[in-house]
Amino acid sequence: GVIYGISAFGLANNLRIPRDEAKAFIDNYFEKFPGIRKYMDETIAFAKEHKYVQTLFGRKINTPEIGAKGPRAGFAQRAAINAPIQGSAADVIRRAMVRVPAALEDARLPARMLLQVHDELLFEVPEAAVDDTIAAMRTVMEGAAAPAVHLDVPLTVDAGQGANWAEAH
């Protein structure tokens, strides 16, 4: 919650701790990670000036409520901070999904993509092709940002397998 702009009051309620303890935690967090506070402040300022924010890929996300007053102001600011992060993650998974059919065909894999949930892809794969499919999909997903965006931190992919989605976790 801290990175999404939770208040000391909200954190205290969530953790059932005194408000002054929650405030100290938030203050300490931003002292240890000053770049996060800078990102938050710059993102809010940009959103207020332009009425949108952008993902890493340049996709614009409108922030029409950013000038709101009262309780809506905090919500609008948190939404503006979060939108580039979650929007960029959505862009990455979409780019991966577009590349999946060609990757499966190129590797002659009998797998079938069934579903996407947030940053997860679910496949139906014959047992004999599981390892090769995992390797191919790991390559697709870890390279999904390229060549449009160079990431300083590599994307990493966790993979699981099972007879159903619950077992795969």
Q: Where are the model-predicted features located?
A:
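Conserved catalytic core of nucleotide polymerization and phosphodiester-bond processing enzymes
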Residues: G1-H169
